[in-house]
């Protein structure tokens, strides 16, 4: 007897929103990761026009969950006013977390397990605590920064993520000048995008209540005040003889982002707007010290699944954990840098680690034109990466 397998459901993006990205201890420092996630999720759902009772699950990425409370993704659901019947799962794939949620949402929809999923990422690096060990009886106690411990430290080689990038730069011959020039261009693109309102369709303002009234944050905070000459004069951070500086690396930030992923059948049934179709996705891994080049492995895998080549791709979003990361992957993939991070990247806009994968995805969805293909990819600690291929469409295919 021959079995007939059911046709897989196609997954579509029907809503997308992100908060502005705040500086470390900046405009968003008083807002928790949960509240940032709620802001992004509510806006994405509102824009999708999907009734809240039609949502099956929330998948939310967060890396620095310490002191956020139990089940952060579930808190976004309950505190956000969504039905208690909506399931929720928190995802930690380090910096890939927010993009992995989109891939997992697409998988569940293709399998027929879910019809509508809110996939996002959130991080408040300004609100992360310090750790102290238990059982102190007498004497001094050392504190550990949870940002470094759980987010920015390679536990396999016992070095900072920045040292991994230094290793890549030396091996690939990437110079300090190349990294600085790349960073300066990222800042230029970001500031130009802010000035021209290029982010207005993706950003939802964050309202902060203070004793003096309500403060509204509506623009990315990090790019403002960038100075090319000062950037070129900064000293290396991780290796005195190295080339990675605070200026050509991504900063520490706060922010959240979310998309609503729906099956084509459900999107038609609900009459939702359609923003893009998820074509394929892939993960790839290599040695932990080489996490920097992992996107160059995940991207070809995703393209192969889509039946596409790099020449079919109109725009790329490759997360700029460091300028050296972007340069190393562009070199390996042979991509035209004029098509990469056209609105500026994480070096300029910021890198709230649990949210960044979703942020670049939302930016890509908004940047593409009808019928164009785009790729979003991001590396993560441990030597891995996630990549997603999408097609810009305005209706279910």
From Swiss-Prot:
Secretion signal, residue range per the UniProt entry: none
Residues annotated to bind CoA: 187, 230, 250
Main location: other
CDD domains from the UniProt entry: thiolase
EC supergroup of this enzyme: transferase
Gene Ontology annotations for the cellular component aspect, listed alphabetically: mitochondrion; peroxisome
Active site: 95, 351, 379
EC number: 2.3.1.9
Domain of life: Eukaryota
Alphabetized SUPFAM superfamilies for the sequence: Thiolase-like (SSF53901)
Binding sites annotated in the UniProt record for K(+): 187, 246-247, 249, 347
The keyword Metal-binding belongs to this UniProt entry's keyword annotation: yes
Catalytic activity: 2 acetyl-CoA = acetoacetyl-CoA + CoA
GO MF annotations, alphabetized: acetyl-CoA C-acetyltransferase activity; metal ion binding
Reported function: Essential for n-decane utilization.
UniProt similarity note: Belongs to the thiolase-like superfamily. Thiolase family.
Protein name: Acetyl-CoA acetyltransferase
Encoding gene, per UniProt annotation: PAT1
């Amino acid at each position: 007897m021959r079995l007939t397998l059911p046709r897989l459901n196609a997954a579509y993006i029907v809503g997308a929103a992100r908060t502005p990205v705040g500086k470390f201890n900046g405009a968003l420092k008083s807002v928790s990761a949960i509240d940032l996630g709620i802001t992004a999720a509510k806006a994405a759902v509102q824009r999708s026009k999907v009734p809240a009772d039609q949502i099956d699950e929330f998948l939310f990425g967060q890396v620095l969950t310490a002191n956020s409370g139990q089940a952060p993704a579930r808190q976004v659901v309950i505190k956000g006013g969504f039905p208690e019947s909506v399931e929720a799962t928190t995802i930690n794939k380090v910096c890939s977390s927010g993009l992995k949620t989109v891939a997992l949402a697409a998988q569940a929809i293709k399998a027929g397990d879910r019809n509508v999923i809110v996939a996002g990422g959130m991080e408040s690096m300004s609100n992360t605590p310090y750790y102290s060990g238990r059982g102190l009886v007498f004497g001094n106690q050392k504190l550990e920064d949870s940002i470094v411990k759980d987010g920015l430290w390679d536990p396999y080689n016992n070095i900072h993520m920045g040292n991994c990038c230094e290793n890549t730069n030396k091996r690939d011959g990437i110079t300090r000048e190349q990294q600085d020039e790349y960073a300066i261009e990222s800042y230029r693109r970001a500031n130009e995008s802010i000035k021209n309102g290029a982010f207005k369709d993706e950003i939802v303002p964050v309202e902060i209540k203070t004793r003096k009234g309500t403060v509204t944050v509506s623009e990315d905070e990090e790019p403002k005040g960038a100075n090319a000459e000062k950037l070129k004069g900064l000293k290396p951070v991780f290796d005195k003889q190295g080339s990675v500086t605070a200026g050509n690396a991504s900063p520490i930030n706060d922010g959240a982002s979310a998309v609503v992923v729906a099956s084509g059948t459900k999107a038609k049934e609900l009459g939702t707007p359609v923003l893009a179709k998820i074509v394929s996705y892939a993960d790839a891994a290599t040695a932990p010290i080489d996490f920097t080049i992992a996107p160059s492995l995940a991207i070809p895998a995703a393209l192969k699944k889509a039946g596409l080549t790099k020449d079919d791709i109109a725009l790329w979003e490759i997360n700029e954990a460091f300028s050296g990361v972007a340069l190393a992957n562009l070199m390996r993939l042979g991509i035209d840098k004029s098509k990469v991070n056209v609105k500026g990247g994480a070096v300029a806009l910021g890198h709230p680690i649990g949210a960044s994968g979703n942020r670049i995805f939302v930016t890509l969805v908004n940047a593409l034109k009808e019928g164009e293909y785009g790729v979003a990819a991001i590396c993560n600690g441990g030597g891995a990466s996630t990549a997603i291929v999408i097609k810009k469409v305005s209706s279910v295919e």
